[in-house]
A protein has these predicted regions:
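A late C-terminal transmembrane helix in Major Facilitator Superfamily
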Residues: 312-314, 318-362, 369
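Transmembrane alpha-helices of Major Facilitator/SLC transporters
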Residues: 245-268, 278, 282
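Conserved MFS/SLC helix-loop-helix module at the cytosolic interface between two early adjacent transmembrane helices
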Residues: 60-99
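Cytoplasmic helix-loop-helix junction between adjacent transmembrane helices
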Residues: 106-142
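Central cavity-lining transmembrane alpha-helices of secondary-active solute carriers
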Residues: 50-67, 118, 250-262
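Helix-loop-helix hairpin linking two adjacent transmembrane segments in secondary transporters
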Residues: 131, 136-185
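C-terminal transmembrane helical hairpin of 12-TM major facilitator-type secondary transporters
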Residues: 272-317
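Symmetry-related core transmembrane helices of the 12-TM Major Facilitator Superfamily/SLC fold
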Residues: 165-182, 365-384
Length: 399
């Protein structure tokens, strides 16, 4: 490979990478405004978290189906669609000032854009990145988008008391990048026969199902625990100040992004080290949340957000790294979609907590999360030896 080609390959990952940042920005821009909507748009806690969770309605179908489409038809068309959906999501959120249903519609379309980006843009980055750097780049861009979105929206709303302005800023920025990326070359589409030959091995699927999926819900489970559960436990859930909400999101998602370059150094090929470290950090997070639930301490809550962010970043890097290493070249999008679809189970934790609080003490909800996290760790430790088994021949794409 010539130096010119290497330079082109190294530089081109920025185009889908920025798409992940922009769709992640859109996905989380509502997060820091949850308390603001409760205070100034008179949404109940349950209603505000249902708006947050409605995002999953648009996201999951894209994660389940769009990966295979992108594997066959190429990454670029679906990356462009991701940006278009993300722009549409921000536009619909702007209409939320008129009726709550537009908030739900905007969040659903935002989920469509994020789901498309997660499978198509992540796979695009993988294809133009050498070695294991694809997972680091994709994970970092995703986390960076999740971090900057709520900070920008929180800052703009804090200064103007106008969330519609925050959504407009995102829509304009994403539209500008859409025009730019439209003129960049994409990855080639794969023929059905080629895709079948380049499928994931049976051993790879076994590792994915037994080792990766059990830890996947905690990737975003820890993220939402840090920026949504912590304000609820400190007594600031329904009346959380915009500043406190923005800080918890910035701390959680910011550390999720910042820790990934360091966590990469802790990894060892052929091991589940990052998954174990991430789950141990997650368990520690929920241990710290126990006194937060008992005392409502803001200081301890911020410590929990720090730990949650670290766990999120480590688990995202470790899980995505395993997925991209296991997936056959013709099924990168498909396996990535499966991984993220399970990751987003954790996104429902704040909504479940808001419903739990109607009937029981939130302390027991935190204890339950901790126990489930321990069970995931046991599952990972029990199956980590599968990584030592050589990968066999790929199975057909339809499996």
């Amino acid at each position: 490979m010539t130096a010119a080609i290497r330079t082109q390959r190294a530089g081109s990952w920025w185009f889908p990478g920025i798409c992940l940042v922009l769709t992640g920005w859109c996905a989380n821009q509502y997060v820091s405004l949850i308390g603001w909507y409760q205070q100034h748009r008179e949404l109940s806690e349950v209603a505000a978290f249902l708006v947050l969770a409605s995002y999953v309605v648009g996201l999951l179908p894209m994660l389940v189906f769009a990966g295979s489409w992108a594997d066959r038809l190429g990454r670029k068309p679906f990356t462009l669609l991701a940006l278009i959906a993300s722009i549409g999501g921000s536009v619909l959120l702007m209409l939320g000032a008129q009726a709550e249903m537009w908030l739900h519609a905007g969040r659903v379309l935002t989920g469509v854009g994020m789901g498309l980006a997660m499978v198509a843009a992540t796979s695009w980055i993988k294809e133009v990145s050498p070695g294991a750097s694809g997972a680091v780049r994709a994970g970092l861009c995703t986390s960076l988008g999740f971090a900057v979105g709520p900070v920008i929206s929180g800052a703009l709303v804090g200064a103007t008391w106008n969330p519609e302005l925050a959504y407009l800023v995102h829509a304009i920025t994403a539209a500008a990048w859409l025009v730019l990326i439209a003129f960049q070359p994409g990855t080639p589409r794969r023929e059905p026969v080629q895709q079948a030959v380049q499928g994931t091995s049976a051993q790879g699927l076994k590792i994915f199902n037994r080792l990766v999926l059990p830890m996947a819900p905690w990737v975003f489970g820890l993220a939402t625990s840090g920026f949504a559960v912590v304000p609820a436990l400190t007594g600031r859930g329904a009346g959380a100040s915009l500043l406190f909400s923005t800080i918890t999101v910035a701390v959680t998602m910011g550390l999720g992004a910042l820790i990934q370059p360091f966590a990469r150094r802790w990894d060892r090929p052929g091991t589940a080290r990052l998954l174990v470290i991430g789950l141990l950090t997650a368990i520690t997070t929920y241990l710290v949340m126990i006194p937060v639930a008992l005392t409502g301490s803001t200081a301890l809550g911020l410590v929990a957000s720090v730990l949650a962010g670290c766990a999120n970043g480590i688990l995202l890097l470790g899980g995505l790294g395993q997925v991209l290493a296991l997936a056959g070249p013709g099924e990168v999008g498909k396996l990535t979609g499966r991984f993220y679809s399970v990751c987003y189970i954790g996104f429902l934790i704040p909504t479940l907590l808001s419903l739990w609080r109607l009937f029981a003490d939130p302390l027991y909800f935190i204890l339950l999360l901790g126990v489930l996290c321990v069970l995931s760790l046991v599952c990972v430790l029990s199956n980590r030896t599968l990584l030592a088994v050589p990968k066999m021949q790929p199975v057909k794409s339809g499996s």
